[in-house]
C-alpha cells in the first residue's frame, strides 16, 4: 500500500510491551489528552473473575479510562486470536465511527500480529478428529503425539511443548483435516489491518529493572488477595490446567500450590520466574517488530510526550 493511500485510512495506536512495563498507566494518561478509546489486547484480561493475578485495571482506573474487551469470557471458555481479531475490528470500527481513535494496549503479541497482518485460513475444529486424537493420547500419551507432530511439522513441534495438549492436538488436527501443516498454513496471511497504525513499545531500559518490577508486582498481587481469587476459581470444580485461563502466568503456579504439588515459597518462586520468562518472550517478539517506537518505562512523562509528539498531529 502506498503512503498516500495509507494516509487516507483511519488512525489507530498500538501500545505494546512486556508485563509490568507500565502500559496501562501510560494509556490512561494518553486518554486524558488525546481523543482515544482503549481496547485491551490481553489474552488473560478477557476472563471474568481473574482480576488480581492479571493486573486488570481497577475500578478507579476503568472509570478514568474504560477498556473494551475486558471480562468477555468465563474462565471455562476458549478465545482464539481469530476471535480477538473479529472483536477488535468491531470495536475499532465503532470507535472510529464516533470520531475517535482506537488505542490498543496490551502484551499479547499474537493478538497484535493477528490484527495487523490478518490470519491464515485454518480449518475449523472437527469434533471427530479431535476425539480420535484424544483417544490416541489416552492410550499412548501426549509424548507419543508430540513425536508424531515432529515427523510431519518439526517447526510447530519445536514451538509446542509436549505438555500442552490443547495446542498439540490443534496442530495435529489441522494436519489431519487439511493435509497441510500448521506451519505451512500460518505462512499465508489474511487481510491486513485497514488502519494507519502508530506503534509504540514501552519497557524499562534494563532487564534488571524489569525483573525488579515483576517481583514487586507479584508480591503486591499476593498482598491484594491473589490466593483467595484463585481459591474461588479452584472451588468451582469445572476448571483445570488444560484450560488457557488456568495456564495464565501466576494462576498455573498458584493452582499447583492449591493442589498440594508445591509449597507456598516454591509457588512464589515459580510465579516470578514464569512472569520473567513471559516478559522475555514479549521483548524478543517486539525486538523483531517493524516500525515500532520504543519508550522508557522509567521516564513516564517523557514516554507520554514522545507519544504526543508522534501522534499529536492526529489529535484534532
Swiss-Prot record:
Entry keyword ATP-binding: yes
Where in this protein does the record put region Interaction with isopentenylpyrophosphate transferase?
Answer: 206-229
Its required cofactor(s), as named, are: Mg(2+)
Keyword Nuclease in record = no
Instruction: Tell me which residues are marked as the site Interaction with substrate tRNA.
Output: 108, 130
> What's the EC number here?
2.5.1.75
Cite the binding residues for substrate: 19-24
Q: Which reaction does it catalyse?
A: adenosine(37) in tRNA + dimethylallyl diphosphate = N(6)-dimethylallyladenosine(37) in tRNA + diphosphate
User: Where is the site described as Required for specificity towards tRNA substrates containing a purine at position 29 found in this chain?
Assistant: 280
Inducing or repressing factors: By 2-aminopurine.
Residues annotated as binding ATP: 17-24
What family does this belong to? Belongs to the IPP transferase family.
Functional note = Catalyzes the transfer of a dimethylallyl group onto the adenine at position 37 in tRNAs that read codons beginning with uridine, leading to the formation of N6-(dimethylallyl)adenosine (i(6)A).
By what name is this protein known? tRNA dimethylallyltransferase
Provide the species name: Escherichia coli (strain K12)
**Gene label:** miaA
Amino acid at each position: 500500500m502506498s503512503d498516500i493511500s495509507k494516509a487516507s485510512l483511519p488512525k489507530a495506536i498500538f501500545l505494546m510491551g512486556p508485563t509490568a512495563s507500565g502500559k496501562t498507566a501510560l494509556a490512561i494518561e494518553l486518554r486524558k489528552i488525546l481523543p482515544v478509546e482503549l481496547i485491551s489486547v490481553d489474552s488473560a484480561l478477557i476472563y471474568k473473575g481473574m482480576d488480581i493475578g492479571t493486573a486488570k485495571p481497577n475500578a478507579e482506573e476503568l472509570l478514568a479510562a474504560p477498556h473494551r474487551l475486558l471480562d468477555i469470557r468465563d474462565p471455562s471458555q476458549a478465545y482464539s486470536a481469530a476471535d480477538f481479531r473479529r472483536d477488535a475490528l468491531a470495536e475499532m470500527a465503532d470507535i472510529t465511527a464516533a470520531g475517535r481513535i482506537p488505542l490498543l494496549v496490551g502484551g499479547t503479541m499474537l493478538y497484535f500480529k493477528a490484527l495487523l497482518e490478518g490470519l491464515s485460513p485454518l480449518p475449523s475444529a472437527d469434533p471427530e478428529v479431535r476425539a480420535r486424537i484424544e483417544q490416541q493420547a489416552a492410550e499412548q500419551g501426549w509424548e507419543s503425539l508430540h513425536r508424531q507432530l515432529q515427523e510431519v511439522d518439526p517447526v510447530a513441534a519445536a514451538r509446542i511443548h509436549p505438555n500442552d495438549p490443547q495446542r498439540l492436538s490443534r496442530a495435529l488436527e489441522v494436519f489431519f483435516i487439511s493435509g497441510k501443516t500448521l506451519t505451512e498454513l500460518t505462512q499465508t496471511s489474511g487481510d491486513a489491518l485497514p488502519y494507519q497504525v502508530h506503534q509504540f513499545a514501552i519497557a524499562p531500559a534494563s532487564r534488571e529493572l524489569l525483573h525488579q518490577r515483576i517481583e514487586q508486582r507479584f508480591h503486591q498481587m499476593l498482598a491484594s488477595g491473589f490466593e483467595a481469587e484463585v481459591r474461588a476459581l479452584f472451588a468451582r470444580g469445572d476448571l483445570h490446567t488444560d484450560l488457557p485461563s488456568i495456564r495464565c502466568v501466576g494462576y498455573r503456579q498458584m493452582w499447583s500450590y492449591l493442589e498440594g504439588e508445591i509449597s507456598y515459597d516454591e509457588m512464589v518462586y515459580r510465579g516470578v520466574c514464569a512472569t520473567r520468562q513471559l516478559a522475555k518472550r514479549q521483548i524478543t517478539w517486539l525486538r523483531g517488530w517493524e516500525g515500532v517506537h520504543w519508550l522508557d518505562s522509567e521516564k513516564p512523562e517523557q514516554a507520554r510526550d514522545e507519544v504526543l509528539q508522534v501522534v499529536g498531529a492526529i489529535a484534532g
